[in-house]
């Protein structure tokens, strides 16, 4: 709902470095969402902000229940606010953004932001990220989908990855490119802002899905252990276009035979999985076994898609979740 007056923004705060202060045992998120908004005068001068504090933790400590609560709060807030902004730790921000892109309504948009430096740092990046996120969330062109705004750049949730552990320019969108960039004259759009993800029903995340990595000399025991624990699905983070060691291939075949859904992704940052290589462990052989290739999604986002699909009240076509996105 776009207001002709001061735009309204609902902020969903979850903790993270943007709320962090230095202590004897390191940085911890101690500042509330209200405190963070009040510390940036440009926000109160231009926006009517309200806040819901969903969590107060590092993003690595968030649970699947937390991200469901974030999604539910986004949906409620979007009914009355001109924009919705989620304050989130950077380590898992891309995962939450992609989950929101999958489950929030088709007429809802949400912008996630945070910081690499604490609020008490001599040169904090949080205030500028907040201002930019508010501007993006209330922009008339940004009407659907989930985004990450960071370091003057707006990224689509499906594309964005954290590529630097500490630099304020932490995120990029790889071969997809930016959605927009903040300039002195406002947001400059490089392509239409839209969701690039399939739509899944929002529900409690009751399924169990794990990520198993592969490497030289690592066999399939990690996957077998996951199956023995009763998981519903496994994402195998493979090499190249989706190739795994022979013993991992054996474990995949066993898992599929026991009803576990297996998605194979690539640890490469660009490109996509493809059923090119045969032989025992090649992606073509894995597809013949019944594995699903994850396309260009990384393992963590593929897990979010599989988790949401397997938790849905109705059957979902798993393979279609990993089709290439179609731009309108």
Predicted regions and their residues:
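ATP/NTP phosphate-donor binding region
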Residues: 1-76, 233, 250, 261, ...
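Accessory alpha-helical/coil subdomains and C-terminal extensions
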Residues: 7, 12, 39-43, 158-232
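Short, ordered loop/turn segments at secondary-structure junctions
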Residues: 14-16, 56, 89-91, 115-118, ...
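Short acidic, glycine-rich surface-loop motifs adjacent to enzyme active sites
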Residues: 79-93, 229-241
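Short Gly/Thr/Asp-enriched flexible loops that form oxyanion-binding sites at enzyme active sites
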Residues: 86-108, 246-253
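Short, acidic/small-residue loops that bind anionic groups at enzyme active sites
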Residues: 97-127, 138, 257-266
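Internal gly/pro-rich beta-alpha loop/helix module
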Residues: 112-183
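ATP/nucleoside-binding phosphotransfer catalytic cores, i.e., glycine-rich phosphate-binding loops
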Residues: 246-328
């Amino acid at each position: 709902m776009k207001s002709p007056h001061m735009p309204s923004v609902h902020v969903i705060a979850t903790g993270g470095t943007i709320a962090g202060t230095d202590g004897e045992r390191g940085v911890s998120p101690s500042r509330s969402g209200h405190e963070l908004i009040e510390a940036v005068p440009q926000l109160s001068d231009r926006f009517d902000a309200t806040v819901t504090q969903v969590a107060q933790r590092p993003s690595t400590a968030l649970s699947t229940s937390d991200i469901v609560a974030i999604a539910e709060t986004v949906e409620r807030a979007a009914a009355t606010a001109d924009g919705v902004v989620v304050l989130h730790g950077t380590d898992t921000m891309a995962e939450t953004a992609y989950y929101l892109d999958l489950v929030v309504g088709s007429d809802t948009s949400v912008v996630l932001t945070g910081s690499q430096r604490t609020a008490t740092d001599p040169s904090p990046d949080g205030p500028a990220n907040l201002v930019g996120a508010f501007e993006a969330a209330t922009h008339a062109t940004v009407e659907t989908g989930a985004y990450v705004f960071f370091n003057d750049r707006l990224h689509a949730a499906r594309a964005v990855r954290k590529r630097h552990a500490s630099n304020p320019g932490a995120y990029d969108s790889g071969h997809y490119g930016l959605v927009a960039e903040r300039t002195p004259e406002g947001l400059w759009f490089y392509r239409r802002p839209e969701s690039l993800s399939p739509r899944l029903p929002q529900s409690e995340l009751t399924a169990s899905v794990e990520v198993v990595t592969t490497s030289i000399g690592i066999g399939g025991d990690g996957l077998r252990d996951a199956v023995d624990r009763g998981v519903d699905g496994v994402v195998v983070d493979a090499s190249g276009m989706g190739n795994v060691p022979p013993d991992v291939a054996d474990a995949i075949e066993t898992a599929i035979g026991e009803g576990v859904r297996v998605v194979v992704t690539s640890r490469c940052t660009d490109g996509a999985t493809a059923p090119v290589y045969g032989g025992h462990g090649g992606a073509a052989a894995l597809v013949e076994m019944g594995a699903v290739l994850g396309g260009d999604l990384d393992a963590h986002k593929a897990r979010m898609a599989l988790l949401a699909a397997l938790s849905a009240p109705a059957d979902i076509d798993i393979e279609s979740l990993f089709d290439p996105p179609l731009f309108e």
